[in-house]
């Protein structure tokens, strides 16, 4: 370790230098500030006398610290003036030593200061290395979650496709229910996270229908009471399928699958929940699912006109549906109408100009 002694008094400088050399330090000496600054670039410790010819000790401290920030600087002074000591500390001095210098105390102070310097060097190096590792970990974690998110969306799409293979209309229905649920949740002031999650989870509401026999699922007519009891099981089947996952979206999907046929007045299934017993996700999807089912063609029914479906949902507010959800839904009436008409126009052009006609007497009671 190299110590720079900056002292204009030859006797004091040589005494300190000799003692420190015997203590195992490499010593460099300077009798003025200009030479001290010139020699300070690679030293570990600098002992600077306050009273120097030409450049003041305070100025020397400042310049040494600017040139070699890691250097430990001691101010050597015969004065008790605290103002001078304060100015030296403000200039960058780490400690001060009073004259006449106690050489053993000087050695101990230097040794202690160097130990602290080494500790801080290793600590800073470690922190820098740790910061780099944390950056890499964050980057790796970000990549992992991006891959996980992509994987999850693929799973959601596969689950939707499973429904599509059983009922070709189901896939488009689930997409519309997802969009409607997201818009209703947004209109209700739900969090951005919830809006995103319900938009992806709502399309899974009927996933349990993959466990319903085709003779019931695709029956072109009203179900018998026995058949309807079997159809009701799609809610619990869907819940069992989705609830096995720890994914927040699939957990929400399980909740929706189980509760989207519950009704505000307690007349729904499978558990006959009512009002606030029904989770908000189930209340939202109940409206989205019912509306889309009303205006869509099914093997057992023709579609209702949009205006008629809106008014039917409105008339059932506080009966079958949550008043709060219906209120948000009706605020979106123009936007929803535009989207559905645009989709209908696209379907009509693809089907050679054919469009669907509604039949009288097809109400919400026909929704499965």
Swiss-Prot record:
Sites of 4-aspartylphosphate modification: 49
Pfam families hit by this protein: HD_5, Response_reg
PROSITE patterns in the record: HD_GYP, RESPONSE_REGULATORY
Keyword tags: c-di-GMP, Hydrolase, Metal-binding, Phosphoprotein
Binding site for a divalent metal cation 3: 169, 173, 289
Entry-linked PANTHER family: CYCLIC DI-GMP PHOSPHODIESTERASE TM_0186 (PTHR45228:SF1), CYCLIC DI-GMP PHOSPHODIESTERASE TM_0186-RELATED (PTHR45228)
Protein name, UniProt field: Cyclic di-GMP phosphodiesterase TM_0186
């Amino acid at each position: 370790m190299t110590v720079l002694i900056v002292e204009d008094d030859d006797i004091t400088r040589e005494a300190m230098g000799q003692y420190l050399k015997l203590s195992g330090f490499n010593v460099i000496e300077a009798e003025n500030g200009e030479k001290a600054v010139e020699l300070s670039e690679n030293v570990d410790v600098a002992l600077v006398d306050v009273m120097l010819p030409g450049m003041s000790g305070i100025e020397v401290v400042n310049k040494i610290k600017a040139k070699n920030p890691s250097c430990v600087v001691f101010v050597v002074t015969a004065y008790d003036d605290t103002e001078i000591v304060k100015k030296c500390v403000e200039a960058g001095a780490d400690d001060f030593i009073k004259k006449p210098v106690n050489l053993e105390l000087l050695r101990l102070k230097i040794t202690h200061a160097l130990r602290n310097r080494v500790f801080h060097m290793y600590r800073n190096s470690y922190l820098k290395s740790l910061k780099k590792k944390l950056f890499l970990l964050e980057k790796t974690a970000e990549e992992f979650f991006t891959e996980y998110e992509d994987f999850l969306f693929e799973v959601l799409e596969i689950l939707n496709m499973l429904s599509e293979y059983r009922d070709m209309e189901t896939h488009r229905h689930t997409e519309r229910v997802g969009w409607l649920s997201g818009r209703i949740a947004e209109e209700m002031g739900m969090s951005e996270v919830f809006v995103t999650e319900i938009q992806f989870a709502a399309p899974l509401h009927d996933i349990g229908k993959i466990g319903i026999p085709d003779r019931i699922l695709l029956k072109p007519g009203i179900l018998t009471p026995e058949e309807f009891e079997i159809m009701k099981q799609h809610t619990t089947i869907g819940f069992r399928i989705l609830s096995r996952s720890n994914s927040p979206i699939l957990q929400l999907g399980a909740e929706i699958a189980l509760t989207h046929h519950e009704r505000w007045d307690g007349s729904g299934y499978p558990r006959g929940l009512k009002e606030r017993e029904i989770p908000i996700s189930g209340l939202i999807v109940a409206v989205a699912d019912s509306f889309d089912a009303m205006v869509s063609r099914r093997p057992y029914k023709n579609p209702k006109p949009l205006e008629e479906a809106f008014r039917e949902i409105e008339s059932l507010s506080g009966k079958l549906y949550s008043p709060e959800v219906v209120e948000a839904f009706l605020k979106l009436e123009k936007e929803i109408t535009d989207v559905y008409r645009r989709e209908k126009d696209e379907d009509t052009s693809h089907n050679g100009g054919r469009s669907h006609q509604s039949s009288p007497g097809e109400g919400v009671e026909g929704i499965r």
